[in-house]
């Protein structure tokens, strides 16, 4: 019998202190990591529910355990809602993460040793798109494409590599690319060599849902995403498709369970269902439009302050600041900005001479600040403060001045009130 009178801060003060400190950090630091966001209290309520107790191996109506009639409702709601969000006719909401969703796609459609063609991590791709340190680069023969001197995807190079290497799968998507992707061009390249087109839209799923970024659904054989980032839900993954054959759907279903996962996380799936409902609200489109406006305001301000943005600007929620040739590294810049209560992540940029542990770049994103309520002028102010720190990363007076300004700005825009 559990006592409702015992509080976490009494039972486990060490952990409670860490949780409280993190809650405080999220309130008084500005969050510019492009892959992070704040989910709603409703999402957190669902994720903290009694559904965390329930095992439910299988799928709605086809479980290997009894007592699943209510979690079936939760999962079916998530499935139907995400189909509506993206105009899909197939959806699997069970992947525990975006990386596991990607792994499921590879294992469902490929054999070990098959060739895949994906974007280089060093040029803005993701670990799971064929990086040698990832299972996708170990199980499969991964060929990588990149960006040109303008920082744009070189579609001619993608076509040349596809023609030369005859991949079984072409992977489109990114973790650090700030322009729109020509999904139709990617599909034409894949079709030219008889390959699957697999799109990982983890970073831009919320923008796609709101119609402010082109949708890959009409072009890709299969699409994956995380459910956090711009989609603003709990941490997790999904697989969706439009026009997928029954055979393809069966392969995807069986590889998620029982192929690579056992029991799904029903409390997380319930939280996904809440987030997907939120994504169908008119306010969600307004939010995503503001995400892009804020990103463009930040990028333009940094350019005006003399900083190079890879590709020259942004058409989505993120930007890469290229500091090749500057004395400050990405690692040092991240640390200096952190002292000023601005949270970012160091990031490699194309042709980066520094190691991935040091880097010559910063990745900045606006989903989290936009959730707080930031508008363009707030983003311009923030970009100027970032430039102030980057101009003088060891000047304690500058860091203190910016920290005070950031703290005041955060108080105007509380996350949870």
Swiss-Prot record:
<comment type="function">
    <text>Catalyzes the reversible interconversion of serine and glycine with tetrahydrofolate (THF) serving as the one-carbon carrier. This reaction serves as the major source of one-carbon groups required for the biosynthesis of purines, thymidylate, methionine, and other important biomolecules. Also exhibits THF-independent aldolase activity toward beta-hydroxyamino acids, producing glycine and aldehydes, via a retro-aldol mechanism.</text>
</comment>
<feature type="binding site">
    <location>
        <begin position="125"/>
        <end position="127"/>
    </location>
    <ligand>
        <name>(6S)-5,6,7,8-tetrahydrofolate</name>
    </ligand>
</feature>
<dbReference type="InterPro" id="IPR015424">
    <property type="entry name" value="PyrdxlP-dep_Trfase"/>
</dbReference>
<feature type="site" description="Plays an important role in substrate specificity">
    <location>
        <position position="228"/>
    </location>
</feature>
<dbReference type="GO" id="GO:0019264">
    <property type="term" value="P:glycine biosynthetic process from serine"/>
</dbReference>
<comment type="subunit">
    <text>Homodimer.</text>
</comment>
<dbReference type="InterPro" id="IPR015421">
    <property type="entry name" value="PyrdxlP-dep_Trfase_major"/>
</dbReference>
<dbReference type="InterPro" id="IPR049943">
    <property type="entry name" value="Ser_HO-MeTrfase-like"/>
</dbReference>
<dbReference type="InterPro" id="IPR015422">
    <property type="entry name" value="PyrdxlP-dep_Trfase_small"/>
</dbReference>
<protein>
    <recommendedName>
        <fullName>Serine hydroxymethyltransferase</fullName>
        <ecNumber>2.1.2.1</ecNumber>
    </recommendedName>
</protein>
<dbReference type="Pfam" id="PF00464">
    <property type="entry name" value="SHMT"/>
</dbReference>
<keyword id="KW-0554">One-carbon metabolism</keyword>
<dbReference type="GO" id="GO:0004372">
    <property type="term" value="F:glycine hydroxymethyltransferase activity"/>
</dbReference>
<comment type="pathway">
    <text>Amino-acid biosynthesis; glycine biosynthesis; glycine from L-serine: step 1/1.</text>
</comment>
<feature type="binding site">
    <location>
        <begin position="355"/>
        <end position="357"/>
    </location>
    <ligand>
        <name>(6S)-5,6,7,8-tetrahydrofolate</name>
    </ligand>
</feature>
<feature type="binding site">
    <location>
        <position position="121"/>
    </location>
    <ligand>
        <name>(6S)-5,6,7,8-tetrahydrofolate</name>
    </ligand>
</feature>
<keyword id="KW-0663">Pyridoxal phosphate</keyword>
<keyword id="KW-0028">Amino-acid biosynthesis</keyword>
<keyword id="KW-0808">Transferase</keyword>
<dbReference type="InterPro" id="IPR019798">
    <property type="entry name" value="Ser_HO-MeTrfase_PLP_BS"/>
</dbReference>
<dbReference type="GO" id="GO:0035999">
    <property type="term" value="P:tetrahydrofolate interconversion"/>
</dbReference>
<keyword id="KW-0963">Cytoplasm</keyword>
<dbReference type="GO" id="GO:0030170">
    <property type="term" value="F:pyridoxal phosphate binding"/>
</dbReference>
<dbReference type="InterPro" id="IPR001085">
    <property type="entry name" value="Ser_HO-MeTrfase"/>
</dbReference>
<dbReference type="InterPro" id="IPR039429">
    <property type="entry name" value="SHMT-like_dom"/>
</dbReference>
<dbReference type="GO" id="GO:0005829">
    <property type="term" value="C:cytosol"/>
</dbReference>
<comment type="pathway">
    <text>One-carbon metabolism; tetrahydrofolate interconversion.</text>
</comment>
<feature type="modified residue" description="N6-(pyridoxal phosphate)lysine">
    <location>
        <position position="229"/>
    </location>
</feature>
<comment type="similarity">
    <text>Belongs to the SHMT family.</text>
</comment>
């Amino acid at each position: 019998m559990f006592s409702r009178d015992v509080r976490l801060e009494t039972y486990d003060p060490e952990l409670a202190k860490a949780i409280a400190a993190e809650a405080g950090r999220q309130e008084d630091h500005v969050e510019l990591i492009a892959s992070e966001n704040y989910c709603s209290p409703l999402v957190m309520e669902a994720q903290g529910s009694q559904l965390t107790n329930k095992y439910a191996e299988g799928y709605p109506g086809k479980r290997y355990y009894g007592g699943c009639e209510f979690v079936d409702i939760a999962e079916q709601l998530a499935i139907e809602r995400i189909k509506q969000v993206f105009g899909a006719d197939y959806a699997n909401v069970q992947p525990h993460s975006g990386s596991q969703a990607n792994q499921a796609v590879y294992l469902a459609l490929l054999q070990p040793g098959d060739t895949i063609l994906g974007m280089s991590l060093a040029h803005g791709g993701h670990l799971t798109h064929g990086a040698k340190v990832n299972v996708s680069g170990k199980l499969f023969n991964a060929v990588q494409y990149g960006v040109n001197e303008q920082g744009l995807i070189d579609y001619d190079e993608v076509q040349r590599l596809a023609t030369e290497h005859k991949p079984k799968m072409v992977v489109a998507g990114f973790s650090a690319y700030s322009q729109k992707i020509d999904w139709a061009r990617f599909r034409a390249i894949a079709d030219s060599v008889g390959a699957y087109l697999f799109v990982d839209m983890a970073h831009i799923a919320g923008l796609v849902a709101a119609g402010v970024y082109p949708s890959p659904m009409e072009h890709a054989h299969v699409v994956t995403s995380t459910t956090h980032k711009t989609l603003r839900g709990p941490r997790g993954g999904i697989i969706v498709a439009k026009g997928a054959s029954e055979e393809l759907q069966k392969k995807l279903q069986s590889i998620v369970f029982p192929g690579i996962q056992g029991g799904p996380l029903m409390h997380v799936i319930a939280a996904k269902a809440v987030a997907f409902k939120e994504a169908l609200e008119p306010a969600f489109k307004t939010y995503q439009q503001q995400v892009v406006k804020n990103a463009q305001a930040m990028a333009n301000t940094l350019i005006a302050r003399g900083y190079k943005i890879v590709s020259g600007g942004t058409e989505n929620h993120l930007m890469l600041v290229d500091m090749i040739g500057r004395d400050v590294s990405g690692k040092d810049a991240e640390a200096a900005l952190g002292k000023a209560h601005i949270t970012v992540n160091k990031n490699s940029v194309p042709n980066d001479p520094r190691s991935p542990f040091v880097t010559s770049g910063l990745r900045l994103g606006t989903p989290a600040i936009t959730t707080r309520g930031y508008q363009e002028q707030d983003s311009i102010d923030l970009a100027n403060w970032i430039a102030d720190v980057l101009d003088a990363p060891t000047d304690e007076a500058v860091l203190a001045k910016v920290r005070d300004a950031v703290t005041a700005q955060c108080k105007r825009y509380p996350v949870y009130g």
